[in-house]
């Protein structure tokens, strides 16, 4: 299994530099790839803040990517839930990941962030 960094994923998704897109596609499509949540967070940040990609488009692009059989992440269900929160709520992606863990894996999350606390499941 190979790990890719944010630059590989960005070139693959954006297809803004043909030569790098082709090389990224060869890596992503040609072997088993693991994408850590830290890399996903960087991809989300760059797409939103530097490229101005709408949140829903980010969600759809990453869902398409992680739906590939050869792509693994820390926890697909948590990431999918995080992407839903990120696309619908005015929260940053790391908070969306915390909500994913809270809603999917029932992990208790502690925060001083009032907005985040309103979205947490409490048992």
Where are these regions (language model features)?
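Acidic, PIN/NYN-like endoribonuclease modules and their adjacent C-terminal/linker elements
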Residues: 1, 99-123
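Short, well-structured N-terminal submotif of metal-dependent ribonuclease cores
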Residues: 1-35, 50-60, 114
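Alpha-helix capping/helix-boundary segments
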Residues: 8, 39, 78, 98, ...
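A general alpha-helix detector
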Residues: 9, 42-46, 61-64, 81
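Residues that scaffold the ATP/ADP-binding catalytic core of kinase and kinase-like folds
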Residues: 11-13, 46, 119
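Short active-site oxyanion
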Residues: 30-32, 70, 104-108
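Acidic catalytic patch
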Residues: 37, 60-87
């Amino acid at each position: 299994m190979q790990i890719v960094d944010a630059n590989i994923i960005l070139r693959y998704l954006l297809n803004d530099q043909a030569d790098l897109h082709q090389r990224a596609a060869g890596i992503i499509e040609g072997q088993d790839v693991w994408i850590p949540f830290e890399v996903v967070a960087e991809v989300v940040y760059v797409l939103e803040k530097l490229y101005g990609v709408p949140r829903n488009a980010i969600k759809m692009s990453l869902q398409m990517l992680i739906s590939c059989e050869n792509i693994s992440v820390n926890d697909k269900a948590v990431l999918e839930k995080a992407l839903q929160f990120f696309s619908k709520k005015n929260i940053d992606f790391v908070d969306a990941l915390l909500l994913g863990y809270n809603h999917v894996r029932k992990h208790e999350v502690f925060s001083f962030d009032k907005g985040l606390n309103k979205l947490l499941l409490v048992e």
